[in-house]
């Protein structure tokens, strides 16, 4: 699972996920990519599940880059616990995704196979995404 080795603070405030991606919206490594169309939150399990499904489909040929990293802790209180007594313990690690952010990039496989693999991966994600190529890289959506 993806998570930071160490953080300055254990817990973080919730915050708001508004606006568009100001970084990570162009292709940097691969030829084809998966780009977020709407805002959402992705956790380490979802990233790993999508990565495994895409990697299995391309039969470990080519290369996949994960362009997101869950560095924000989400807390949760235990079940059947009364309110109060402080903030809960860290439950999972997430990253806020804004529209336009690239999630995965892929290279070294035929485009049709890459599209099929990324389609399998996008079904594992909790927000709408689309598949883009190098020509479409500069568009936000």
UniProtKB/Swiss-Prot annotation:
Gene Ontology cellular component annotations, sorted alphabetically: cytosolic large ribosomal subunit
GO molecular function: rRNA binding; structural constituent of ribosome; tRNA binding
GO biological process, alphabetically ordered: translation
Domain of life: Bacteria
Pfam families registered for this protein in UniProt: Ribosomal_L16
Entry keywords, A to Z: Ribonucleoprotein, Ribosomal protein, RNA-binding, rRNA-binding, tRNA-binding
SUPFAM superfamilies: Ribosomal protein L16p/L10e
Keyword 4Fe-4S part of the UniProt annotation: no
Keyword Phosphoprotein: no
UniProt-listed PANTHER family: 50S/60S RIBOSOMAL PROTEIN L16, LARGE RIBOSOMAL SUBUNIT PROTEIN UL16M
Subunit structure: Part of the 50S ribosomal subunit.
Function: Binds 23S rRNA and is also seen to make contacts with the A and possibly P site tRNAs.
NCBIfam families xrefs: rplP_bact (TIGR01164)
Family named by the database record: Belongs to the universal ribosomal protein uL16 family.
Name this protein carries in UniProt: Large ribosomal subunit protein uL16
Gene: rplP
């Amino acid at each position: 699972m993806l998570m930071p080795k160490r953080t300055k603070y254990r817990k973080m405030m919730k915050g708001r996920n508004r606006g568009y991606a100001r970084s990570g919206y162009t292709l940097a490594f691969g030829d084809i990519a998966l780009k977020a169309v709407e805002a959402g939150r992705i956790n380490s399990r979802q990233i790993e599940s999508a990565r495994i499904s895409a990697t299995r489909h391309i039969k470990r040929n080519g290369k996949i880059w994960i362009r997101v990293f869950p560095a924000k802790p989400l807390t949760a209180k235990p079940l059947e616990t009364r309110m109060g007594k402080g903030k809960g313990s860290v439950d999972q690690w997430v990253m806020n995704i804004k529209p336009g952010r690239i999630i995965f990039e892929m290279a070294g496989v035929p485009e049709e196979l890459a599209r099929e693999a990324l389609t399998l991966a996008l079904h594992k994600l909790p927000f709408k995404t689309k598949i883009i190529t190098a020509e479409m890289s500069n568009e936000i959506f």
